[in-house]
Design a protein with these regions (language model features):
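Feature of Fe-S/electron-transfer and energy-metabolism proteins
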Residues: 1-295
Length: 295
């Protein structure tokens, strides 16, 4: 009999709600009962009112249960958790949850589906396809595709990403940098944290493509120190990507170089502003620079 796949998020919000305790209780109870279970720690779908959210793989799809406490595990197993059976904590198929059913997720497309540090999972769900295609294009062509797509940043008043990339590509300079501002200083805003913890390879791939487009060979991910889990996940992801050849002196055997480094922020709100962030990355006090020039 093959092991049943059970997914419990490793996202810091889920962990704060008791996900680690639920995972330990499930493993212990299943071992005691002789039940074959493959426990997978996935990213979070962002349904924090249901965390810890336990998902069970069935023939029909993933069935959701939540919020689950460690003390609920014996009763859930008695009720047929591993078969996706009905229970008071059950919500049916995850994709049919009202909050998710009408969504078309783009940046969060893999959230809750893949394991954050699994290169195989990432590639199986479309990962690295964009980078491989970008390596077949000229830098000008990459920028033009971004312009034609109308891609805009999630912050920065929806400034067109292609315009920013084109400006950097055309700027003179022997050394250019790509910087990800993940300081996320606005209270209650956790979309950056979810991306860093839940889909770090997506960020790595995007920054590498940006580096190819503008001629940058070095990148920094600036993460606030209040996000220790995000720092840890991102650091591990960079190491794995480098080991697999997606970062380093010869990206995917293309001859192009791009390296990434995590820099921890001190938690100053002002460092969410781009020039203050650059000051901080350079080891200086995080204060806003006079403009121009603009970074």
């Amino acid at each position: 009999m093959s092991a049943v796949q059970v997914f419990i998020p490793c996202d810091s919000a889920a962990v704060a709600c008791g996900a680690n305790e639920v995972a330990a209780a499930l493993q212990a109870e299943c071992a005691q009962r002789g039940l074959a279970v493959e426990l997978l720690r996935n990213s979070s779908r962002g349904l924090f009112w249901l965390e810890p959210l336990v998902e069970v793989q069935t023939a029909a799809g993933r069935v959701a249960y939540g919020p689950v406490a460690a003390a609920d595990i014996p009763a859930l197993l008695d009720a047929g958790l591993l078969q996706g059976a009905p229970h008071a904590l059950g919500h049916g198929l995850v994709e049919q949850l009202p909050y998710l059913a009408k969504q078309e997720r783009l940046t969060f497309a893999r959230m809750g589906i893949t394991r954050p540090l699994s290169l195989a999972d990432y590639e199986a769900h479309g990962g690295w396809a964009g980078l491989r295609r970008a390596l077949q294009l000229t830098p000008v062509a990459i920028v033009q595709e971004v312009l034609d797509a109308g891609l805009r940043g999630r912050g920065g008043a929806a400034f067109p990403a292609g315009v920013k990339w084109r400006t950097v590509a055309q700027a003179a300079g022997t050394q250019k940098y790509i910087v990800c501002n993940a300081d996320e200083g606005d209270s209650g805003t956790f979309s950056d944290r979810m991306t860093l913890e839940g889909d770090p390879f997506m960020l790595i791939e995007g920054m590498t493509i940006a580096g190819l487009a503008v001629g940058a060979t070095q990148g920094y991910v600036y993460i606030r120190s209040e996000y220790p889990d995000a720092v840890a996940v991102m650091t591990q992801a960079i190491a794995l990507a480098k080991q697999a050849g997606f970062l380093g002196s010869d990206v995917c055997g293309s001859g192009h170089a791009f390296t990434l480094e995590v820099r921890k922020a001190a938690g100053a709100y002002v460092c969410g502003e781009e020039t203050a962030m650059l000051e901080s990355i350079e080891g200086k006090r995080g204060i806003v620079r006079a403009k121009p020039p603009l970074p």
